[in-house]
Amino acid sequence: MENPFEITNVIAREILDSRGNPTVEVEVYTPISMGRAAVPSGASTGTHEALELRDGGSRYHGKGVRRAVENVNKIIAPEIIGMDVTWQRDIDTLMLELDGTENKSNLGANAILGVSLAVAKAAANALGLPLYQYIGGTNAYVMPVPMSNVINGGVHAGNELDFQEFMIMPVGADSFREAIRWVSETYHVLKKVIMEKYGRNAVNVGDEGGFAPPMKEVTEPLDVLIKAIEEAGYKPGDEIAFALDAASSEFFDGEKGKYVVAGKEYDKGELLELYRELVTTYPIVSIEDPFHEEDWEGFVMITKELGSKVQIVGDDLFVTNPKRIRKGIEMGAANALLLKVNQIGTLSEAIDAAYTSFRAGYGVVVSHRSGETEDATIADLAVALNAGQIKTGAPARSDRNAKYNQLIRIEEELEGIAVYPGKKFRNPFL
């Protein structure tokens, strides 16, 4: 009798992401199920991220992924066909061995991750389980508080704002459904407020669905957000708080050793002072990448100074890499991890990174990339890990809303059990 969990076929193809760039999609088949996964891609990437294989040449302006697709079809597929689809860690480990490099540059993290996620989905489908339950077991019931990126700057936008993301967090809501309603209502009022102040062209949206008005000073978006939240009928801070992603590797001048914000140069002490002022003036509860990816000292300073009242998130600092996370934990750099599955390249390693962080008392924010697809795996992953936080853009563009809509479905499925952590997003179990 055939094993219903045996992998019978693996197919990879090139598809388009939300920016119109090629990315990898993989399907894994068993006699009784199929799992499909599409791989996201970032714009502001940390230098220590696992390598995304691109073809170069003129096709798709060099961004084609035919090599990665071929690596799945010709190298990975023959090795995993015949394996049990529920052997997630064995399959992930085998792919790492096949690749043989530290940063997955041989087969490509985009090839490996596509297979890793498709395997998990095929296994969940074979067992008749939702993905969050397959990964997280019966204890997966914490809904994430959304960090919704409603005003964009940095490399995600064409304006002069140096900070990359200005996000709202509905910490006062009672459920995920209520939270997403608050975000949506605020987003629509924000559009009106921006249009009144900056004109019609200012409400074009960026890669992640947020607005990119012609702002320069970092206080401008925060003032506009306060106004929008109040006009939407909510209390800034108490009901809807702010989160920032400075993405400061992008505005660090390596030659001068200075950070350049709104045309002004700051050393790390002065930049820390700017963050302190912002946190004192506005209801900011989380700051991501406040210093550049090698400024461990800056991260230690801000964590000591502000970490008791503000979440300090490492993205480019950690790149979801357990080695770098352990270094941060030892030094006291940051107190939360931004978890991006494609930064590390397999589901098993991403889960390890999350648990390494949890054990040290760090928060975990499950995150999208700026180049996304309709794949909603990260919604299930956020619930599977009981992470309590998700960062997946504004409530606009289907590539972002695919994740929010999946979370609405999951909360409905967990009716009576689901917990929305609200202000306890950093540690839902406290």
From Swiss-Prot:
List the active site: 208 (proton donor), 340 (proton acceptor)
Species source reads Thermococcus kodakarensis (strain ATCC BAA-918 / JCM 12380 / KOD1) (Pyrococcus kodakaraensis (strain KOD1))
Residues recorded as binding Mg(2+), renumbered to this chain, are 245, 288, 315
| Metabolic or biological pathway, per its Swiss-Prot or TrEMBL entry | Carbohydrate degradation; glycolysis; pyruvate from D-glyceraldehyde 3-phosphate: step 4/5
Listed GO CC annotations = cell surface; extracellular region; phosphopyruvate hydratase complex
- Keyword Transferase present in the record's keywords: the answer is no
Cofactor: record remark: Binds a second Mg(2+) ion via substrate during catalysis.
The alphabetized UniProt keywords are:
Cytoplasm, Glycolysis, Lyase, Magnesium, Metal-binding, Secreted
Q: Where in the cell is it found?
A: Cytoplasm; Secreted; Cell surface
**What InterPro entries does this protein's entry cite?**
Enolase, Enolase-like_C_sf, Enolase-like_N, Enolase_C, Enolase_CS, Enolase_N
Query: What are the required cofactors?
Result: Mg(2+)
Give the similarity note. Belongs to the enolase family.
* Transcription recorded as keyword: no
State which gene encodes it.
eno
Instruction: Identify the domain of life.
Output: Archaea
Return the broad EC class: lyase
* Function of the molecule: Catalyzes the reversible conversion of 2-phosphoglycerate (2-PG) into phosphoenolpyruvate (PEP). It is essential for the degradation of carbohydrates via glycolysis.
Per the UniProt entry, what is one GO biological process?
Answer: glycolytic process
| Substrates-to-products reaction catalysed | (2R)-2-phosphoglycerate = phosphoenolpyruvate + H2O
This chain's protein is named: Enolase
Q: Name one Pfam family in it.
A: Enolase_N
Q: Which GO terms describe its molecular function?
A: magnesium ion binding; phosphopyruvate hydratase activity
EC number(s): the record gives 4.2.1.11
Q: Which PANTHER family match?
A: ENOLASE
Q: Where does (2R)-2-phosphoglycerate bind?
A: 164, 340, 369-370, 391
